[in-house]
Structures are given as structure tokens and as C-alpha cells.
């Protein structure tokens, strides 16, 4: 069985973070492991508190994983401090990690910054160049490229600039301002659009975590990047189409929409 590792924060409500990652990886047929960067107290209406892991303990988690069950792919989500980013970069380099997918979580849905300036600098200098693919949304792509994105042409220019700057593939996720659910993958000097139909579901908590984890899962199984993106988009469409409705805010998706078997009912 292929394996995948998520390095991210814990979401106590189960809709995003490592909880969403583990569900996604399991649903996509790989064995999921996790290294936790932070504990959060949150639900569908917001985050009330964050308890950050120490660099030493994060390093211990990564050592424990890589020296026993080596991951076939690695997904990195929100990492809030430069010290933790340094630790991750050091360990991934030491263990020669492969198929690294970075979801550069930098901006909250409200538009507020989630990372301090030193953390942004560490992220861009140390983690992004290690990635096989980055998965920024529109606001994050604007930060990484230094460009304003208001249409498809702007999305193409920014995605191309990010790919050239960090030497990796970039999947820029539409949907924030343009293109409905169309995403743009840029790599090796060329761009490819992945078209998707917008699903009228207000419960979208954890969509970014889910997409990047699904891509990592398919890379772990040996799929090429284009196929991994196609399958990840199909999976997240299924999660949204299941129309799960939980909580008082923007609720979680149904990561196990396709789960069948004798243990499900009852």
C-alpha cells in the first residue's frame, strides 16, 4: 500500500487541517500519516485559539515517520512560524522526501494575513523551491507573484511567474474572483486549464486542504501530475456534491461520500 504524509495543523472540528487530509488520503487509497504543526480550537464559525507545536517536537514526529514508514508523497499545509518551516525543510532535505505538495496557506478567507513576515520569507526561501507542485488560491498567488489577478490572463501571468521563480509546477485555484471552478496548472513553461463546474454548496470548509491532499495521494500512487490534478478535482467535486450540512457556519464536506460497505449503515 502506498503512503502519504500530511504536515499541517489540527482542526478540532474535523473539516480542515490534518483531519481533512487524513480522510482525503484514506478515501483516495493511500495510508495516511501526520506530523502536527499546531493544535487549533475551531469550528465552522471560526478559530478561537491556536497552540503551536515546538520545533523540537515537530522534528521528533518527522524522524519517527521517516525512519519507519517512509512516505511516498508529502503534503504541507499551514505552518505559522519560520522556526517550524526551517525544521520541515531540514528534515525533508535530510530524508530526501519526494512528491512534495505545498498548499501555501497565507491568507484567511476574510483576507487577513495568517503568517508573519519572517514566516513568509522562510516559506518562500526554503519550502517552495522543494515542492513538486504548489497549490495557491488567487489571493496567495497575488502575494507570491506580486501581481494583481482580475481575469484569466492575469491568472496565467501570475502562475507562470511563480513557476519560474520557484522552479516547480503551480496549480492556481480559481473560484475566488474568476473562472468559477477552473484551475490553471503551469509547469515546464506551459499552462493547462482544468475546467470544473461550480457546485452551489455553501459548505466549503477545508477545500484547499482536501485538494492538495488528493493530489499528493495520487502522486503517491504513481500517477503523473496532470492525472493527479484531474482525479483530485473529480474527488472534491464528489465531496461537495454530497451536500453534507453540519454546523452553524461554513461546514465541512463529505470526504467519505463514496464509502460503501457493511460498517457504514446502522
Label the predicted regions:
Residues 14-30:
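N-terminal basic/disordered segments at the start of proteins
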Residues 117-191:
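Conserved phosphate/ATP/ADP-binding segment of small-molecule kinases
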Residues 142-143, 201-225:
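Short, small-residue alpha-helix embedded
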